[in-house]
Amino acid sequence: MRFFLGLFIVFISADFSFGQSLQSSATPKTPPSKAAGCAPPTTTTYLELNNVRAMIHTAGNLWQVPNQNFSQYEIPKNSGIMALFTAALWLGGTDVNNQLKLAALRYRNGQDYWTGPLTKITAETTYENCSKYDRHFVTTQDMIREFNAWFEAGLADQQNGTNTQSQQFPDYKVPEIIKEWPAHGDVTQGQDYYLAPFYDFNGDGHYNWEDGDFPWYDIKKDKECNVDRSVSLYGDMNYWWVMNDKGNIHTETGADPIGMEIRAQAFAFASNDEINNMTFYNYELINRGTQTLYNTYFGFFTDGALGDPFDDYVGCDVSRGLGY
């Protein structure tokens, strides 16, 4: 290996921990269940806040250039050096009849994941729903801090008869992403009302940016991380999207779907230390399926190729839930 760099990718989970590989002796088969006929997701965005330039997809995998044997996890950025090839969630288990239910990807030779939330009771989706959510919702912490400062300055002006907002923010325009933040699912279709995390400024339970609500970075530091399991937005720059495994027939694994809704985040920090060479990923898993899974394994498939792909080593620190 001719090139070495302190490289670190952290996969954070809100509802599970990575560990054992997904294994089963059952042979996958093409499921007879109804599918929504969703098209494969196509959105690709680069996460390049710090010293890493990483290709992020809505389709369930990371880094690999679509339909090519090349990757885009470049570190240092603009060096032409690709340190990792691809990665994806592997989720699987058996139902009460010992039938395998599995959602997984390797190199996108097929598709097991689609975009959009599922209905809460029946774990269903539609072609239109999948298409609507085929995007990354990109925010930065600086953007949210500026919006909050602008809004609170306006409140102070109303209370005190001042004009601080116009003086300090003369040309400010509320970013479109704050206005169109996907805080709520479509309850008329049976989706969860609460979708993407948001800060509810007036506590009315409804997202409205004109009331001071914003995509929820914990900028007010009122989240007790040691006891609060609710998921906020992380990082200095954050890409949020939502996926499911019920949008169509599983052509990557050939297995029956689970009915899993996955709320994903890819994020990074800008810093002057090792974190500047890192990217982070968070997956919140919600089982919308009607059946309990047994013998269940959640894992994260990673094909790393640091320099020469034939002399790489992997390891883990079990006590810290860390793979490297």
Question: Which residue stretches match the model-derived regions?
Answer:
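Bacterial Sec-dependent N-terminal signal peptides
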Residues: M1-Q23
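A long-range scaffold signal marking pre-active-site subdomains of enzyme folds
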Residues: Q20-Y324
